[in-house]
C-alpha cells in the first residue's frame, strides 16, 4: 500500500486517450495533459446515471476518476498489467493488495457465502453489458445505495443481482446489516438532479459542490456545467475562481458554464484564457467567444482572438468528416454571423448523417432567422419522419405553427412535445404558456400546477403561475407563488415588487 498518493496523472491520462468517452482534438504526445489532445464528456445524462454510474458506453476513465481509489493515488497499473491487461492477482487478490482480507474478504463484511456476491467487484464494481456481449464494470467503486435508487432511479448492485427483489428490500437488508445512509436528501447527486429538473432553490447547494475540493474534479466540473445550463444567477460567482484553476478540467467547465453571460462581460472574463496552455480549454473559449464583434476590440485583443479562431477552424478541419464537428462548425459560423458558412456546415453534417436531428433543428432555425420559413418548416417535417417521437422536433414544429397562425396545430405539436419531455421542464412550460396565450388560461394554470408539483422551484413556472393565477382572481395562490419565487433569488427587485403587489391585493 502506497504511503503517499501519486500526484502525477500521466499514466491515467495515457490510458484515458482510449478508455474514455471523448472526442479527438490532436495527436498523442506523451506527458501532455489529456485535454491537450481530447475533449472529455462530463457526467451528464444520458451518458451517466444521475449519481455518476455508467449508463451509456462511456468506458472507464470517467467512472474511475470519481473513485476514492483515484483520489488516494491508485493508478491503472496497480490493478492491471498494462500490456496484457491481465489482473495483478486473481479474484479478490487484486483488492487485497491494499485492503486487509481479514477485514473485507469475509462473510462478516460482505454477508455472502463464497461464490457470487462474495467477490469485491460484485458489490463495488457492478457490470453493464453492451451490445449483448461486452460486460464492463463501473470503475467508480462505490458502495451500493438503494436509498438513492428509490429517489433517483439509479441502479444498485443489490437489485442488479437479486432481480426478483426491489430497492426497498435492498435498503431494509442493508439496514439489518447495520448499514444505513444518512445523507439521502443532501447527497450531491440528489441535489444536482433537482437542479437538472429546474429547481433553482438548490443552486446554492450546487455552487457549494463546485467549490468543494473534496469532491472529484470531474464531478465539480459537471456541477458547474449544470449550474450554467440552469440559468442560475450563482454561476458567475461559482465559475470565476475556477477560470484560474490549476486543473484544466475545471477551467474548461468554467468557460462552458458562462455561455449565458452577456457577451461583452464574457469576453472580459475569458480574455486571460485566449492563450491557455491546454488545447481543449482554448477550443471552448473560441466557441464561447465566436460572437464577439472584432471591431469593438483593441488591436492586440482582436489579433489574439483571430489567432484563436484560426486554430479552432484548423483543428475542426482535421475532423471535418465527423457530423458532430460539422454541427459545431455550424454553431460557430452562426455565432460569427456567417450564415452561408453555417448553412454549408449543417448541410454537410446531414450529408454525413441524414439521421442527425440536431442538424435538422439548427439548420431550420438558421433558415427561419433568414426569412426562409417555408424551407424551415419542410426541414422540420423531414426531421419528424426520421424521429417521430422526438420532443425537440415537435416543439420546433409547434413554434413554427404559432408563427404561421395555426393555433390548433401549434397546441397539438406542443402537447406532444410536453408528453415526451424527460427531466427538463422547458417543453411543458411553453405548452402551458401557449394554452394561456391561445385562450385557455385555466388549462394553463392546471398544467403549470402539475409541473410545479413534479419539478418545484423553477422560476419561469412560478412566475407564470403567479401572473396567470392573479389574472383569474386567485390572488392568495398567486401571492404564494410569488413568495416562493422571491425565496429563490431575493436579489431580484422585480420579483420582490410582484410579491408585495400580490400580497397587498390578497389581503
PLM segments and residue spans:
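Amphipathic alpha-helical scaffolding segments comprising HEAT/armadillo-like alpha-solenoid repeats
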Residues: 200-210, 232-244, 262-273, 296-313, ...
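Structural marker of alpha-solenoid helical repeat scaffolds
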Residues: 230, 245, 261, 276, ...
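Register position in tetratricopeptide repeats
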Residues: 260, 291, 335, 369-370, ...
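Primarily the internal scaffold of c-type cytochrome electron-transfer domains
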Residues: 1-215, 225, 277
Amino acid at each position: 500500500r502506497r504511503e503517499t498518493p501519486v500526484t502525477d496523472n500521466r499514466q491515467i491520462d495515457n490510458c484515458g486517450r482510449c478508455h474514455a468517452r471523448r472526442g479527438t482534438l490532436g495527436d498523442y504526445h506523451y506527458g501532455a495533459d489529456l485535454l491537450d489532445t481530447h475533449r472529455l464528456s462530463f457526467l451528464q445524462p444520458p451518458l451517466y446515471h444521475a449519481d455518476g454510474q455508467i449508463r451509456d458506453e462511456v468506458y472507464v476513465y470517467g467512472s474511475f476518476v470519481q473513485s476514492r481509489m483515484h483520489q488516494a493515488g491508485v493508478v491503472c497499473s496497480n490493478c492491471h498489467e498494462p500490456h496484457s491487461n491481465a489482473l495483478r492477482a486473481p479474484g479478490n487478490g487484486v483488492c487485497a493488495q491494499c485492503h486487509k482480507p481479514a477485514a473485507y474478504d469475509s462473510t462478516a463484511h460482505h454477508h455472502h457465502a463464497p461464490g457470487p456476491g462474495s467477490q469485491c467487484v460484485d458489490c463495488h464494481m457492478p457490470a453493464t453489458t453492451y451490445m449483448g456481449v461486452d460486460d464492463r464494470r463501473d470503475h467508480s467503486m462505490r458502495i451500493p445505495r438503494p436509498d438513492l435508487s428509490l429517489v433517483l432511479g439509479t441502479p444498485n448492485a443489490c437489485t442488479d443481482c437479486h432481480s426478483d427483489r426491489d430497492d426497498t428490500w435492498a435498503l431494509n437488508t442493508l439496514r439489518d446489516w447495520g448499514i444505513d445512509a444518512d445523507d439521502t436528501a443532501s447527497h450531491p447527486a440528489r441535489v444536482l438532479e433537482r437542479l437538472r429538473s429546474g429547481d433553482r432553490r438548490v443552486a446554492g447547494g450546487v455552487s457549494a459542490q463546485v467549490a468543494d475540493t473534496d469532491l472529484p474534479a470531474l464531478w465539480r466540473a459537471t456541477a458547474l456545467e449544470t449550474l450554467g445550463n440552469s440559468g442560475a444567477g450563482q454561476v458567475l460567482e461559482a465559475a470565476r475562481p475556477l477560470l484560474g484553476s490549476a486543473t484544466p478540467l475545471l477551467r474548461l467547465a468554467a468557460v462552458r458554464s458562462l455561455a449565458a453571460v452577456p457577451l461583452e462581460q464574457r469576453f472580459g472574463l475569458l480574455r486571460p484564457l485566449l492563450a491557455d496552455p491546454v488545447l481543449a480549454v482554448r477550443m471552448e473559449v473560441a466557441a464561447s467567444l465566436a460572437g464577439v464583434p472584432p471591431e469593438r476590440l483593441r488591436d492586440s485583443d482582436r489579433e489574439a482572438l483571430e489567432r484563436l479562431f484560426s486554430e479552432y477552424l484548423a483543428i475542426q478541419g482535421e475532423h471535418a468528416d465527423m457530423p458532430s464537428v460539422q454541427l459545431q462548425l455550424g454553431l460557430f459560423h452562426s455565432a460569427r454571423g456567417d450564415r452561408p458558412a453555417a448553412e454549408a456546415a449543417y448541410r454537410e453534417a446531414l450529408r454525413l448523417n441524414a439521421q442527425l436531428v440536431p442538424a435538422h433543428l439548427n439548420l431550420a432555425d438558421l433558415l427561419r432567422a433568414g426569412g426562409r420559413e417555408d424551407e424551415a418548416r419542410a426541414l422540420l417535417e423531414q426531421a419528424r419522419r426520421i424521429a417521430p417521437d422526438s420532443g425537440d422536433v415537435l416543439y420546433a414544429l409547434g413554434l413554427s405553427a404559432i408563427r404561421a397562425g395555426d393555433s390548433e396545430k401549434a397546441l397539438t405539436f406542443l402537447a406532444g412535445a410536453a408528453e415526451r419531455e424527460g427531466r427538463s421542464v422547458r417543453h411543458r412550460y411553453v405548452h402551458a404558456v401557449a394554452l394561456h396565450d391561445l385562450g385557455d388560461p385555466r388549462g394553463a394554470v392546471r398544467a403549470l400546477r402539475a409541473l410545479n408539483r413534479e419539478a418545484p422551484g423553477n422560476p419561469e413556472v412560478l412566475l407564470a403561475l403567479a401572473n396567470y393565477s392573479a389574472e383569474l382572481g386567485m390572488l392568495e395562490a398567486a401571492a404564494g407563488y410569488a413568495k416562493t419565487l422571491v425565496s429563490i433569488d431575493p436579489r431580484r427587485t422585480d420579483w420582490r415588487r410582484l410579491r408585495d403587489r400580490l400580497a397587498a391585493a390578497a389581503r
